[in-house]
């Protein structure tokens, strides 16, 4: 049994990128699905779709690579962990890596990237950073 589905999803995407795989499969949860949709929106992965196999759901993620075959994702890092939750206010999540990276935040408005959370004026739990 997996305790932290977000960490598992980040690790699976990171490992698939290092192996230069086209597609990887993630365990489904609402937060992982929201995370994958943000990664698609920000251009870090090509696409994601939810696959239902009876009762069990999974998410198929198609990875994105640059022209020279290198993964578009340089680093994915889990910030808030089950043993140590990290919360930031709206002013602390304004920019990451001078705008080249994204902070993914779980807010009262749902899971949002840092630019949308800042525009809405909400802070929350920092799930991960991607650049």
From Swiss-Prot:
Segments crossing the lipid bilayer: none
Gene3D superfamilies, per the entry: 3.30.1370.30, 3.30.1490.10
Disulfide bonds: none
One cellular component term from this protein's GO annotations in UniProt: ribosome
Keywords: Ribonucleoprotein, Ribosomal protein, RNA-binding, rRNA-binding
HAMAP family referenced in this protein's UniProt entry, alphabetically: Ribosomal_uS8_B
Family: Belongs to the universal ribosomal protein uS8 family.
Subunit relationships: Part of the 30S ribosomal subunit. Contacts proteins S5 and S12.
Protein name: Small ribosomal subunit protein uS8
């Amino acid at each position: 049994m997996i305790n932290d589905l977000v960490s598992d999803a980040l690790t699976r995407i990171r490992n698939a990128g290092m192996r230069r795989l086209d597609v990887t499969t993630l365990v489904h949860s609402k937060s992982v699905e929201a995370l994958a949709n943000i990664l698609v929106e920000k251009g870090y992965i090509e696409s994601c779709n939810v696959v239902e196999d009876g009762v069990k759901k999974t998410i198929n993620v198609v990875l994105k690579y640059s022209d020279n075959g290198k993964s578009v994702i340089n680093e994915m890092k889990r910030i808030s962990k089950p043993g140590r939750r990290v919360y930031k206010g709206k002013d602390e999540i304004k920019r990451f890596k001078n705008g080249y990276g994204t902070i993914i935040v779980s807010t009262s408005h749902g899971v949002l990237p840092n630019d949308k959370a800042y525009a809405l004026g909400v802070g929350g739990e920092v799930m991960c950073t991607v650049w």
